[in-house]
Amino acid sequence: MSLKFQKLSGLVLCFLIALPAWFLGQSFPLVGAPVFAIFLGMLLAIFYKNREHTEAGIAFTSKYILQFAVVLLGFGLNLSQVLTVGKTSLPIIVATISSSLLLAFLLQKWFKLDVNTATLVGVGSSICGGSAIAATAPVIQADGDEIAQSISVIFLFNILAALIFPTLGDMIGLSNHGFALFAGTAVNDTSSVTATAAAWDGLHHSNTLDGATIVKLTRTLAIIPITLGLSFYQVYKTKKVGKNQQHTVKLKKVFPMFILYFILASIITTILTALGVNPIFFTPLKTLSKFCIVMAMGAIGLNTNIVKLVKTGGQAIVLGASCWIVITLVSLGMQHLLGIW
């Protein structure tokens, strides 16, 4: 069987996993399509052992379709609009991201956790959940088990945030503006930010959803410096190894070019919008990006050892809980310092 046919067969398989996961995600946005895709892939992997006809396509989807999805994510970012509307939230965003990443780094060292899993949980918790994990995973060369663990942890605390935060905000007396900032800076995934803000609006007959979404988009911009920083760190490590082994390392081979394409897509979106192009024009690209992420998560699920995931998932959950609590406290603390709450 030719390699092209193997790739096509694997792509079709991942598409068939992504399709029901996509519709399940639409029906249950708190869970989200990527989580459904991972679990469907893991369930199928229990029975689907002989993969010689699809292995190449599964590997292609988990790597290159994921990178393609990240590039398309850039078409959802109008840099000027996000920076203009979201600049009031920048101090809170910087504080929450910094504290979460620092905590993830310290806990990884303290408890000797897996470096990649700690990085993905830290980035996913502090920036934008599954999208940040999708952008970061190829940069640090994370494997399927590490990605699946991280996505699962993010999913758990997304649900908790959507269930708890509206009541918590009510109890501590947050204003509508304050809750929009809280939801946008302390909830991981965009769909969960939407669900959390919608729950608040249902209780208060308000409209915090737009504000929370803009704050969330502003927070998403942190993908750029974080992934670039991790990229240069990976280059540094690779060069160090290459020097020890007496061979040179070419920057182009280890630097993830898809991150630069992501930035380029964001710049194109910003320029075209400034020239009068309707933002609706980019909606199909954003939707395609989300679906490609779901396909990639299905492929990752197929390559994930569910037994290992269950056995080693405890550490990731503790790390995720720690990051989630710190982000919540820092978000509220910064609002208090800034006189918003």
From Swiss-Prot:
InterPro entries linked: UPF0324_pro (IPR018383)
Assigned GO CC terms: plasma membrane
Presence of the UniProt keyword Cell membrane in the record: yes
A Pfam family that the UniProt record links to this protein: Cons_hypoth698
Recorded topology in the membrane: Multi-pass membrane protein
Localisation per UniProt entry: Cell membrane
TM region(s), chain numbering: 7-24, 28-47, 68-85, 90-107, 120-142, 147-169, 178-200, 211-233, 254-276, 291-310, 317-339
Gene source species: Streptococcus mutans serotype c (strain ATCC 700610 / UA159)
Keyword annotations: Cell membrane, Membrane, Transmembrane, Transmembrane helix
Family (UniProt): Belongs to the UPF0324 family.
Name this polypeptide is given: UPF0324 membrane protein SMU_2059c
Statement: the UniProt record of this protein carries the keyword Acyltransferase: no
